[in-house]
């Protein structure tokens, strides 16, 4: 494989990286995110990036210790306790109750991706794990997927994040915080069983190693169950060890590994809406003799943190990723379905994908006091490199395979011995990104100001060779872009804090449209105003905001291309709306989380005039969520938790042209019951049981890309979890 095209400024990049790496020779550093004890209490007025080594939280929005309630931008936190209560199996499921997020865009049977949109803009599988991007093959299927067993919490940051993270869409981003080493010894063993023959075992162990300055965390799980779709399975094996070495009072090294093997991940295919209306969620348009999705992901990383003194510190966060994927599947074109008879013409294909990637982020932060003004300064340099390849093949099959009827599906028609390769293509893919960023987080009394900027250099290439040479070629991008953000928040002293921000975003674009015209980089901007409220006891919170986002030169699939591979540049898309998110304790033993989102999204300018005034797909105008827990604290049922939620998603456009109808709204109810078995007997101290029923009333719903490509939502599932901690 050819190496990635280097930057012309690569020598400068190396010099900058060397400058930031020099302190590592003199002393080791500390992981901040990966060393926060789970029971650490956070100071709500803390501005220092680092005060006590390993015990301060850095939020995604600012890469500093600024608390979410002090951040002049929308932030949603989903902690481990909520993840466990809801029994989630993916980040997709974890985001079901997050305001402004539309998740599971390809339904429940397609579980191999965490695909969702924030404030109307798709994230394109760009998730972050402990502050570093999870690399992915753009336009292909290879995306690492972090299992909730290894997650401490999930942060959803609303609005543009390019000022600190570079190439990101304007709607927002998700950062997954890993479970980290702890000094206090604890071990938890879990078993689960449930619908579709679910069997799962998990382990979570942490503690100090003897009397040494080493502490560890070991997370592992094995899970297997049938897919929602007939004839498919889901299977996963995960191990994620990590180690903290407290070298000195001011220096800590964290080393972490994440290995995940997915021998089977369900099926990756769609169906016409007419089939959805007639069939059950278990129906499949695929073939059991050609249904494979295997993925292997290895990530090895480290964090080095060093405090020079009480005010200045340096953090380096790095990760190497080696990932591969192989799938056998079928697909159909828009023109391949006859609604009157149910005849569906399918194509047979495989993809074989792999990549290696390195990501590194260097952060120098310091607190400078000038009179009554405190400046928390942050300067950073990050770099990422990906080198990958993918191959795609199509086959002609036996005659019986082409007699498939979607209304009466027979999923056993394909004869592998009669396959004949008819087309193949291979892609050599690579990209490099170098970013330099700065930020000044200012406090003056009750006023918090935030200002920052970032300059990115991005290059990518995609070299294609195929059995049809007329389609061969090389797609490249070469973009330099400056992004920035300003924001302000004022604490009125009664728990109420109004805020406002303006931020810009940047996304690279490679290749050409269907007419051969080069695609421009995508940029965006957001204006947001709102307020945050927190009661004096920190029990009740409320965030309300109005946002207006404009994305320029937005890229979408060309609706006139039946293969969905050609792209068009829309010109300008706006998204504006209102988000409300609150938490309240109605009693000491009764908590409620609720949110509402109003979203108005529209294509304002487009090269295809028929798209002007349309609403993109996966955009409900109204959505709302509510989750509650009630704890019984006395009597025979003491230790019982009764929890549940309701989530509503409004109707959405079925296709990009807004001519094929609407995807109906839906309301889904979930139930969660927990019990601390230690209340029944002292001998059972540490044992807990949790019963989760998702989609309690078995509501049937679906999502669509267009009328010939739809996916069922999650049907009712029941899961029983038993955990024993000691």
What are these regions (language model features)?
Residues 223-227, 239-307, 320-355, 398-429, ...:
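Acidic/polar loop-and-plug regions of large Gram-negative outer-membrane beta-barrel proteins
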Residues 637, 647-655, 675-726:
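C-terminal beta-signal and adjacent terminal beta-strands/loops
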Residues 135-136, 150-152, 163-241, 247-251, ...:
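Outer-membrane beta-barrel translocator/receptor signature
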Residues 115, 132-158, 177-178:
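Short acidic/polar hinge/loop motifs at secondary-structure boundaries
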Residues 305-309, 313-319, 323-329, 521-604, ...:
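Membrane-embedded beta-barrel scaffold of Gram-negative outer-membrane proteins
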Residues 446, 569-656, 700, 723-725:
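Gram-negative outer-membrane beta-barrel transporters
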Residues 55, 59-68, 72, 92, ...:
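Extracytoplasmic beta-strand/coil segments of soluble accessory domains associated
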Residues 244-248, 355, 374-376, 382-386, ...:
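Structural signature of Gram-negative outer-membrane beta-barrels, strongest in the C-terminal barrel
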